[in-house]
Amino acid sequence: MAITAKPKAGVWAVLWDLLTTVDHKKIGLMYTATAFFAFALAGVFSLLIRTQLAVPNNQFLTGEQYNQILTLHGATMLFFFIIQAGLTGFGNFVVPLMLGARDVALPRVNAFSYWAFLGAIVLALMSYFFPGGAPSVGWTFYYPFSAQSGSGVDFYLAAILLLGFSSLLGNANFIATIYNL
């Protein structure tokens, strides 16, 4: 009997597998890859900020655009990179392996929390394209600055709420995994 090689999966098969996976290792890698995409995007925002500050009286960005880019840079670095890559992506990959478990306790909740995280990034970036533009409130959303109105602020706040929901689901899944397995 001859040993047959497993046929290579096509691009669509691999994409479908990533879209429908509930494997904690794949989801952890997807979290990390998406967080590093957010890191690269925040790096582009940082380059725009540095370009504006390169020479005195630079007109590369208006004051409002500068504040919007500064807000997007800070919030993207904090909410979409540091927390997600450092805790969620790494935790998804490592925690079940450290426990000797085959998977997390709630794999579908784990997958949903990733897709909610990705949706939060999309909402945050969409805020730039609505009337009023992206929020220019700083990443802290401190009240005197956050009193501005506009659809961009609403979309960005919806993104932060969706990200919080995603984090709650993911962390509840970690707690259930550690407690039950």
Which sequence ranges carry the predicted segments?
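...captures the hydrophobic TM-helix bundle architecture rather than a specific catalytic motif
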Residues: 1-181
